From Swiss-Prot:
Pathway: Lipid metabolism; fatty acid biosynthesis. The gene is acpP. It comes from Geobacter metallireducens (strain ATCC 53774 / DSM 7210 / GS-15). 4'-phosphopantetheine is transferred from CoA to a specific serine of apo-ACP by AcpS. This modification is essential for activity because fatty acids are bound in thioester linkage to the sulfhydryl of the prosthetic group. This is Acyl carrier protein. Pfam families: PP-binding.
């Protein structure tokens, strides 16, 4: 597991209040981890802050799972 993978999973678990064991690469924020639209906005903001990147609204809508977030951050850092 890369440092990005590990940190994304930690942030997701912290932001959504779920156990890190539930945060698998395939996990959907809404369907599997119980996030609502506000949670996903806050999650994107936390990822932007942690990785010092800006995620456009258009791109944020495409980030639906843990793997989507990891892929996006890997490509943009």
């Amino acid at each position: 597991m890369s440092a990005i993978d590990k940190r994304v999973k930690e942030i997701v678990a912290e932001q959504l209040g779920v156990d890190e064991a539930q945060v698998t690469n395939e996990a959907s924020f809404m369907d599997d981890l119980g996030a609502d639209s506000l949670d996903t906005v806050e999650l994107v903001m936390a990822l932007e802050e942690e990785f010092d990147i800006e995620i456009s609204d258009e791109d944020a809508e495409k980030i639906q799972s843990v793997q989507d977030a990891i892929d996006y951050i890997t490509e943009h850092t």
